[in-house]
Amino acid sequence: MPELPEVATVITELKSCVLNKPVKQVKVHLDKVLKNTNVKQLNDALVNHSFVDIKRRGKYIIFCLSNGLFLVSHLRMEGKYFFEAKGSQFDLNHVLVEFLFQDGDQLNYHDTRQFGTFHLFNRYQFENARELNKLALDPLDQEFNHQAIFNKGHKSNKKIKTFILDQTNISGIGNIYADEILFASKIHPETLAKNLNLSQYQLICQNATDILKKAVEMKGTTIGTFTFKKDHTGGYQHFLKIHGKKGKQCQSCNTTIIKKKINGRGSYICEKCQIQR
């Protein structure tokens, strides 16, 4: 699943090619991706209007329309956007939504797993959307701070990895970066959140910010299928210290890295650097 750095990278790419282009038509090839609207309503909202800005909240992509409406997209497991210039040849296999622009260009939403979602909101609905309002701050928000995370964590019986994956505690972090953050912090992912002290939360939060910033600079992590445009992959996979390295030696202590399931998530651990407490 694309995490914060991947979503941020997608948005940067989208802003470079689709802003201020009036929409001619929207074609939807799988109705279930539209969660609170339908094809007619979507066309009524978008045709003759343009995307004037694209923002992020957690892992959500927010298309801001020239008429004041908002189209909110979540990529889920395998969602991707591909921009196609006028006259280009492309395959519509796995394309669920086509945004056709009046200048002949188009933006395709591609999703092999078909888990992605779209919500159409007016301003009132957007400001009161449960999907968005339940999200916590993410590590790149200016107001993100370890004291607030500690205040939640010291009351929680969840394992710390499960705790930081919960988007109502910290948004934007997924499985890959959770492993990297906890390894950098030398904290075992099965340690209970309530058993960590304030300084450990400070370490988690600082590492989260540093790692996600670096991953954004590297245009995300490509493990599997992530691309931010056709034939362009991220680069942070070359900087991963622990995720995906089962059976390899820890770069810090040469201990063999193990993999185990924690609440259904494959988790990579150095049992010497990350002692369970």
From Swiss-Prot:
GO BP, sorted A to Z: base-excision repair
Keyword hit for Metal-binding: yes
InterPro entries reported in the protein's UniProt record: DNA_glyclase/AP_lyase_DNA-bd, DNA_glyclase_Znf_dom_DNA_BS, Formamido-pyr_DNA_Glyclase, FPG_cat, MutM-like_N-ter, Ribosomal_uS13-like_H2TH, Znf_DNA_glyclase/AP_lyase
EC number, UniProt record: 3.2.2.23, 4.2.99.18
UniProt cofactor(s): Zn(2+)
Positions annotated as zinc finger (FPG-type): 241-275
Keywords assigned: DNA damage, DNA repair, DNA-binding, Glycosidase, Hydrolase, Lyase, Metal-binding, Multifunctional enzyme, Zinc, Zinc-finger
Cofactor note: Binds 1 zinc ion per subunit.
One GO MF term attached to the UniProt entry: zinc ion binding
Reaction(s) the record says it catalyses: Hydrolysis of DNA containing ring-opened 7-methylguanine residues, releasing 2,6-diamino-4-hydroxy-5-(N-methyl)formamidopyrimidine; 2'-deoxyribonucleotide-(2'-deoxyribose 5'-phosphate)-2'-deoxyribonucleotide-DNA = a 3'-end 2'-deoxyribonucleotide-(2,3-dehydro-2,3-deoxyribose 5'-phosphate)-DNA + a 5'-end 5'-phospho-2'-deoxyribonucleoside-DNA + H(+)
One Pfam family it belongs to: H2TH
Ligand binding (DNA): 94, 113
Active site per UniProt: 2 (schiff-base intermediate with dna), 3 (proton donor), 59 (proton donor), 265 (proton donor)
Stored Gene3D superfamilies: 1.10.8.50, MutM-like, N-terminal
Xref: NCBIfam families: fpg (TIGR00577), PRK01103.1 (NF002211)
Family of the protein in this entry: Belongs to the FPG family.
PANTHER family: FORMAMIDOPYRIMIDINE-DNA GLYCOSYLASE
Assembly and interaction partners: Monomer.
Function: Involved in base excision repair of DNA damaged by oxidation or by mutagenic agents. Acts as a DNA glycosylase that recognizes and removes damaged bases. Has a preference for oxidized purines, such as 7,8-dihydro-8-oxoguanine (8-oxoG). Has AP (apurinic/apyrimidinic) lyase activity and introduces nicks in the DNA strand. Cleaves the DNA backbone by beta-delta elimination to generate a single-strand break at the site of the removed base with both 3'- and 5'-phosphates.
Name of the protein in question: Formamidopyrimidine-DNA glycosylase
Organism: Mycoplasma pneumoniae (strain ATCC 29342 / M129 / Subtype 1) (Mycoplasmoides pneumoniae)
Gene of this entry: mutM
